Amino acid sequence: MTTTAVPPTSTQLCGVFADIDAAVAAAHKAFLAFSDCSLAQRRIFINAVREVASQQERLEYMATAAVEETGMGNAHHKVLKNLYAATRTPGVEDLVMEARQGDDGLTTLEYSPYGVIGAITPTTNPTETIICNTVGMLAAGNTVVFSPHPRARHLSAWLVDVLNRAMVEAGAPDNLITVITEPTPDTTKALITHPDITMLVATGGPQIVNMVLSSGKKAIGAGSGNPPAVVDETADVAKAASDIVQGASFDNNLPCTAEKEVIVVAEVLPQLMTAMTANGAQVVSDPEELAKLRSLLLDTSGTRPNT
């Protein structure tokens, strides 16, 4: 796979700012203008995001650049992740009005935006998260300030610029999404506590998720996952083996939703092991090989990735 997409030649990237205050101020100004846009206009802007983010050359560039900058993942798999984020994230079609009729008349219930959302994105899914958040949050009428993982900051700034340009070309206000150029723990704290940030969304590890959930603001946190796959005597063992191997190997097992361990009843263990091996899994039981794998994959504490 080659990086065929060319980053913008302009020295001024759209929506990219040097500090949190400037990024929030721009997103807040954009929110005021965005509030005057109709649902039909929102759909147009979001369709522009979907289109520009799902072009093959950009999919390949984002996937390859993410692996290069973060040092993590499988570029071929990231192409699919970005494509699905662009094409399958729900948009304005999910904003369904409810109507209730009774003796006192008709009541309608409609969703309203929170305002400016502070969104913290991870190193494991840097572009996928920005695309997904942009579609979903803008569909609801919000604007977004992104705080990317430091090891994905260059690609994140590039993507925010690309998406903003596509939306502006479709008639959107400037800076519907913004990002800072040099994210740090201090800038993340400043984003969380900023008075003009009305909602927080964090995709990352337990520490950052706990920070937003204890911020006192409306917050959604998606932290690290450790999903088990349970296989018992009622399972379709061949299908279970195929699904587990495919899920656990997808994007080098970076997604928090991917299978991380298998719990299996003794009765079907031999059959499952054979089927998993047939699907490309490898059995490693030699202590020396296990030690080498641990040192390759984990840091000296044995509790964190060796990045």
Segments (PLM) and residue ranges:
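N-terminal Rossmann-like NAD(P)+-binding subdomain of aldehyde/semialdehyde dehydrogenases
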Residues: 2-108, 136, 278
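ALDH superfamily catalytic-core signature
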Residues: 6-7, 14-17, 209-307
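Generic structural signal for well-ordered, non-membrane alpha-helical segments
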Residues: 13-16, 20-27, 39, 46, ...
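N-proximal accessory regions
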Residues: 85-91, 161, 175, 290-291
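Rossmann-like NAD(P) dinucleotide-binding subdomain of oxidoreductase/dehydrogenase enzymes
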Residues: 97-239
